[in-house]
Amino acid sequence: AGVVHVADDIDELTVAGAQLARGLLPAKPFLVMGQYSMVDPTRSPAGTETAWAYTHVPREVRGDAGDGDLTGAWTEREAQAFALRIEQRVEALAPGFRGLVRGRHILTPGRFAELDRNLDRGSMHGGTAQLHQQAIFRPTPGLGRPETPVERLYLASASAHPGGGVHGGPGANAARVALNAHRRRRVFGA
């Protein structure tokens, strides 16, 4: 598959979610993982594969539910230790995986925020993915749709419904609304 979600079962997902809600780095992080060259062979040299994975961490780390001493400072040591935890998750489900890894590139929440100021505290969701920021409440009550009070300005970022992680969803919503508005202007001249 091009993209897989990695967790043993719903109970493990529930535990990881509870750990995140308490501000703890999950002992067994839930992963979204993919292989670029499965859908685009030009993304990796012939005979090789490029894999990526991401997980969620608390916006404010209060502790580590794993057997480590991670604090959320995301020093090089902490980034490497958490990446190892992620690799161990994959290794448990795909024995031999770690022996195939030739290199890795780690983007911590702080690095994400440096690369894109829209990613508040490094969140790909443009903020939080908690319930109070979903559906009609995203990004704030009254702006839960792509339309804004500014004519021909539409919300299309991870901060808009349905949020980050629904890759392309906010942009598709905004494009649909913009195209419909354009058609109405052509037909009705308004």
Segments and roles (model prediction):
Residues 45-85:
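Conserved FAD/dinucleotide-binding core of flavoprotein oxidoreductases
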Residues 26-32, 92-161:
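A glycine-rich dinucleotide-binding beta-alpha-beta segment and adjacent secondary-structure elements
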Residues 48, 74, 78-86, 124-190:
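C-terminal structured subdomain/cap of oxidoreductase catalytic cores
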Residues 9-12, 36-40, 58-60, 129-131, ...:
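Short, glycine-/Ser/Thr-/acidic-enriched flexible segments
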Residues 1, 16-17, 43-46, 62-67, ...:
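Short conserved micro-motifs at the rims of enzyme active sites and ligand-binding pockets
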Residues 1-2, 96-102, 184-189:
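Acidic/polar loop patches that form or flank catalytic/metal-binding clefts of enzymes
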Residues 1-44:
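Mid-domain catalytic core of redox enzymes
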